[in-house]
């Protein structure tokens, strides 16, 4: 069977490659067995597969849009920045090593073998693979070490569609310049352009589109309008693009934007209900209705940065007044102490936490817990009492072990005596409708506001909405021709 594939590259980061791949996966899945693939992803937002492997959340979303189970082969290399130019390398879903950029590039040959194996396994089970590049495709300083753009193009010889973002300006120069800078053996496979995030009447673009096609000999497949995606974001670049909720003047949740923040997608489900405001650690915290401390790639360093900035005292001042949630690394920070045997920060030491929960955490070995879980709510306190005994789902991605005398979700997490400080290892907590609504209902009632339940759109409907918008604006006949299907 012919190994069919399609490669989506971009002119820069955050131009919409992931959403384009998601849309194409959804559309093609109606008639074909489709798998997404991203050779190398650098992201702190990750997902745990059913067999406990860790991959980038974008590939999990794309797989679900394609109607297939996410697997580690769809994102064989995941880089999770830890700071100081060092990243944790996740190889086929398992922690491999902490490497500097130079050390990682020295192991590129080894990575290429991993990628080839992953692709072969995917092709055995699927009719077509829709692949995604990373950042800008024309990073000429990286061509000899690149595995995700030029490297994937050379490995698969896939037809390429190049995506540009018009919202930030300069899209024609970006598309033309990217093609001009690509190596000749890759350039020949660029078969189409997509312009993304356009606001206004697309008629005014026609002269530019025509000229771009004449200069490059490459057709423009369509112009996608700017619209609000209802699927999770991939990286922290998009934190600056968050739109307010319809009730943003009524209820506000402050998320502490830790220097090494990870899995900020945990809070996206709240954005349709309240204003979710990301606060840098050196900013004024203001007067929020709830505080969230997210996950982090380095709990201890972010805890030390919180303390150095004075944000620790600002958070502590709200104890007993408003809900304070900590997820994963944020949960660990809420406790009395964190003991590190050297696996987290390089040296053996004990650090004082925020002391908002009666827990202690120990980093004893370089071992990560990655698992999908279902837990029952222990309905202690004013927020959770209405959903006592109900099930919630989530996933864990963490190092360290935490002791807790008063758990909050089954055997997980902790809650203080007043029921307002809640810590948990569960990512995806607010994906659960019962948790989400219990919190927002409490916040509304506390302010004397009428609680208005959210307008719920299912995950499946969100994928269909994206796919339909794509089909309405893209020359699908030409796209099928390019893909060879």
From Swiss-Prot:
GO terms for biological process: cobalamin biosynthetic process. Keywords: Cobalamin biosynthesis, Glutamine amidotransferase. The active site is at residues 328, 427. The keyword ATP-binding does not apply. Pathway: Cofactor biosynthesis; adenosylcobalamin biosynthesis. GO terms for molecular function: ABC-type vitamin B12 transporter activity; catalytic activity. InterPro entries: Class_I_gatase-like, CobQ/CobB/MinD/ParA_Nub-bd_dom, CobQ_GATase1, CobQ_N, CobQ_synth, GATase_3, P-loop_NTPase. It holds the Pfam family CbiA. Residues 250-435 form the GATase cobBQ-type domain. Belongs to the CobB/CobQ family. CobQ subfamily. Catalyzes amidations at positions B, D, E, and G on adenosylcobyrinic A,C-diamide. NH(2) groups are provided by glutamine, and one molecule of ATP is hydrogenolyzed for each amidation. This is Probable cobyric acid synthase. It comes from Methanosarcina acetivorans (strain ATCC 35395 / DSM 2834 / JCM 12185 / C2A). The gene is cobQ.
């Amino acid at each position: 069977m012919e190994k069919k594939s399609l490669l989506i590259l971009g002119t820069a980061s955050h131009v919409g490659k992931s959403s384009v791949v998601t849309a194409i996966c959804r559309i093609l899945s109606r008639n074909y067995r489709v798998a997404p693939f991203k050779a190398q992803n650098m992201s702190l937002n990750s997902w745990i597969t059913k067999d406990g492997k860790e991959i980038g959340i974008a590939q999990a979303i794309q797989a679900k849009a394609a109607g297939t189970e996410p697997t580690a082969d769809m994102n064989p290399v995941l880089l999770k920045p830890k700071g100081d130019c060092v990243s944790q390398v996740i190889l086929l879903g398992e922690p491999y090593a902490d490497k500097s950029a130079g050390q990682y590039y020295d192991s590129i040959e080894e990575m290429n073998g991993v990628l080839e194996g992953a692709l072969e396994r995917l092709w055995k089970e699927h009719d077509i693979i829709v692949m995604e590049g990373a950042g800008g495709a024309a990073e000429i300083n990286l061509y000899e070490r690149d595995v995700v753009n030029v490297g994937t193009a050379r490995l698969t010889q896939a037809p390429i569609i190049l995506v540009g973002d018009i919202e930030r300006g300069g899209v024609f120069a970006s598309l033309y310049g990217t093609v001009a800078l690509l190596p000749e053996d890759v350039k020949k496979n660029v078969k189409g352009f997509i312009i993304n995030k356009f606001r206004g009447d697309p008629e005014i673009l026609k002269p530019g589109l025509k000229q771009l096609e004449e200069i490059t000999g490459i057709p423009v497949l369509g112009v996608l309008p700017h619209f609000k995606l209802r699927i999770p974001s991939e990286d922290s670049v998009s934190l600056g693009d968050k739109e307010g909720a319809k009730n943003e003047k009524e209820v506000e949740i402050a998320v502490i934007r830790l220097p090494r923040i990870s899995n900020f997608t945990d809070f996206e489900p709240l954005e349709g209900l309240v204003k979710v405001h990301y606060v840098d650690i050196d900013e004024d915290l203001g007067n929020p209705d709830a505080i969230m401390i997210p996950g982090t790639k380095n709990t201890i360093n972010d805890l030390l940065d919180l303390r150095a900035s004075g944000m620790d005292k600002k958070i502590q001042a709200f104890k007993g007044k408003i809900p304070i949630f900590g997820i994963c690394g944020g949960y660990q920070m809420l406790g009395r102490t964190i003991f590190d045997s050297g696996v987290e920060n390089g040296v053996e030491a004990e650090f004082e936490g925020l002391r908002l929960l009666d827990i202690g955490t120990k980093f004893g070995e370089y071992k990560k817990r990655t698992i999908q879980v279902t837990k029952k709510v222990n309905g202690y306190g004013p927020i959770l009492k209405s959903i006592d005994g109900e099930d919630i789902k989530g996933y864990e991605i963490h190092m360290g072990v935490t002791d807790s005398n008063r758990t909050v979700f089954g055997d997980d997490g902790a809650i203080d005596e007043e029921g307002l400080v809640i810590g948990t290892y569960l990512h995806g907590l607010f994906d659960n409708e019962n948790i989400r609504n219990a919190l927002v209902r409490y916040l509304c009632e506390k302010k004397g506001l009428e609680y208005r339940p959210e307008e719920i759109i299912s995950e499946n409907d969100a994928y269909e909405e994206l796919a339909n918008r794509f089909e309405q604006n893209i020359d699908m006949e030409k796209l099928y021709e390019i893909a060879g299907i």
